[in-house]
Amino acid sequence: CNLGGIIKNIFVRDCRWKLVDVVLGFDTLEQYIAPEYRKNYPYFGALIGRYGNRIKGGEITIDNETHVLNKNEKGNTLHGGTPGFDQRLWDAEQPDNEHLILHYTSPDGENGFPGTLDVTVRYSIENNVFRVIYEASCDQPTLVNLTQHPYFNLRPTDENIGNHELRLYTSHYLETTSDLIPTGTILSTDQKHAFDFNKPLFLALQEDGLDDCYTFGDPIEPQLMAELSHPKNGITVTILSDYPGLQVYMGKYINVANGKGGKHYGPYSGIALEI
């Protein structure tokens, strides 16, 4: 979809060779732009920019110059402000059935960010691998942190993701304030065992869910970050990336009345693995 680069469906085969759509979303374009969806907006499947996650106070300073950004969550800037890249119409080119190229030019000052930013995002599918490549250039110093926001439910007949197992290949995560603003301190999961996913854990064990950024150093090449699986149907999603962090959000605040096939999506209906 060239609206927000939305990933509407991802079909994979389960252990019985049945095709399963493993991401949350809607059946029609109209549902993605409906006002009631935007009121409690979970960013289903969308490209996020200019800056994924939160910026404290909606202000950034670059070269001693302060830029005031669009503030859209408790006085902070979430996912680049409103409207972000998730609500923009992208130019789309489809060379073949396995590749899609999206391009968007964000003008200088859009949502308060400095510089004209040219962004190209490439989607490709090959040998059961779905690949996302981000490219961006700007005519002046700026901040950019692009990400994707699909919510996975590997067994859509389940009302929630409690029976999914998650493994994360790191022992570190970012400390945050009560408003989920990073403090700049990297903590070890040894200090808070509820955050330790070095071994696969059922998500049902996370009583209050997760909305946290796990850190992976500064990789030069894509490295293994996460594995999400459902034991009953044999589907596993493996995440590799050269990003330094992976935001894990268990969808605590999802409340959508009319998802795919008219299904109600409530809290913990899907898990977002944002890279």
Residue ranges and their predicted role:
Residues 1-275:
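An exposed, glycine/acidic-rich loop-and-rim segment of catalytic or binding clefts
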